[in-house]
Amino acid sequence: MLADAKPGTLPYISIQQIAVKKGGRKALYNESEENVVLDEYRKHVAERAAQGIVPKPLDASQMAALVELLKNPPAGEEEFLSDLLINRVPPGVDEAAYVKASFLAAIAKGETTSPLVTPEKAIELLGTMQGGYNIHPLIEALDNEKLAPIAAKALSNTLLMFDNFYDVEEKAKAGNPHAQQVMQSWANAEWYLNRPELAEKITVTVFKVTGETNTDDLSPAPDAWSRPDIPLHALAMLKNAREGIEPNEPGNVGPIKQIEALQAKGYPLAYVGDVVGTGSSRKSATNSVLWFMGDDIPYVPNKKGGGVVLGGKIAPIFFNTMEDAGALPIEVDVNNLNMGDVIDIYPYKGEVRNHETGELLAEFSLKTDVLLDEVRAGGRIPLIIGRGLTTKARESLGLPHSDVFRQAKDVAQSTRGFSLAQKMVGRACGVDGIRPGQYCEPKMTSVGSQDTTGPMTRDELKDLACLGFSADLVMQSFCHTAAYPKPVDVQTHHTLPDFIMNRGGVSLRPGDGIIHSWLNRMLLPDTVGTGGDSHTRFPIGISFPAGSRPVAVP
């Protein structure tokens, strides 16, 4: 599989090779008929537009066809083809990203050409791909005097380096000035400081859902098959009528017109509710909310981040999932906030005021000041990975610990002992025990992924440029969809097992049984694990259920 290829080996891939791998139609073999690919894509765009949603990102077959078209672009299609290359290919280690990275690397090395992409532009575009297959060509370019400054800038803002960090470090120690520049940039946390700080005042329009919002309201279980397709799945958000909510088609399509009317006021929307995020579908629920109320992520198709959620109470795992997406979740009294109100949020002061009158509507305190760093970094996980990169760079350069980032507050010292759970988490963090409220990053030994969340976890793994698991046991099951699979489930049954196993995981097969009964036989005592299922509970050791993105991190 293309996804199995390691960064550092990016052979040029032809459209014919991809067509064979994918069982592509005959048009993909014939360069004179490549315009058929464009026609098919435009047909897909029109079909999705009729549903009110954007097209899917390019897959490997389409990306391979695009490569051939970019080499010899049809007259009048130049801008369209460039936009597809820049904005419609998933980042990370997606198969289409492999084709894109290999093409751009070939241009940078002079192995192929395109009138639309210069070697300098190729390196610049490689720098937008976040991590994975783009890293090795960027590191190689540090030795090219003409391309090195562009590659250094790209790498300075790239977090998903993992073991490739040592390749840059080696070049820096060997005297490469551009590699030294990258190391110094990482050490200075410029990847973080170059991003805008959270604004002193955030003006939003209230989208209020009274009472309790369960994740099933935001990501209905009958529509679970569409969860990986974020724009399509978001159409089902709040599709059932309730107080203050007016679905376009009750039972089928949520309040799209109502959302658009509020957006017409000219401000981003904030999701507001009395109780928000209870239930088990946290990641897909977060995706749906942010699709309407979040910010576009540059160069990343069909996914959004940022956004604001205000809740009288926000369920803990939903809160964490919002953090991971770079959103600002705030627990605050929402009684004075009504649908359609325009409000000003002052995150540093802890105030919510009426935008027109300045009237104080509510006061709050953030759960932790580190939340401000998370929003600036683009999410909790980018912050964790980025801080680690900065720490490694500073250690390599012999510099003291960075003071750029906010630190979690120390918990009060105690002479009391630890419970067994505190000891197990402590062992996973390399200490004797963990006190309530103490920040730690435990090593996950066992990870479970089931089939209704597995495709989303796969997408997260691709985004995180994962080519191998660090957890000792990662298990994927198909216990939710084996009995009555939809067509999309059948496709998942065929493709997900290899994806997991090629990264060192264990994949059950449809009909093998329930994930918990398998996982529980393989657990190690006194270890910590997680699972993409709200009822993940270990009889040995300790587990923390999580959304699809945290499950992808171990």
For each predicted feature, which ranges?
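Amphipathic alpha-helical scaffolding segments comprising HEAT/armadillo-like alpha-solenoid repeats
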Residues: 60-67, 91-110, 130-142, 161-172
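N-terminal mitochondrial targeting presequences
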Residues: 13, 18, 28-33
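Short inter-helical turns and helix N-cap capping residues of alpha-solenoid HEAT/ARM repeat scaffolds
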Residues: 74, 114-115, 143-147, 176
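Fe-S-dependent hydro-lyases/dehydratases of central metabolism
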Residues: 143, 150-554
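N-terminal polybasic/positive-inside topogenic patches
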Residues: 5-16, 24
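Structural detector for internal amphipathic alpha-helices that build alpha-solenoid repeat scaffolds
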Residues: 51-56, 79-95, 109, 116-131, ...
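Amphipathic alpha-helical packing elements
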Residues: 30, 34-67, 72, 371-384
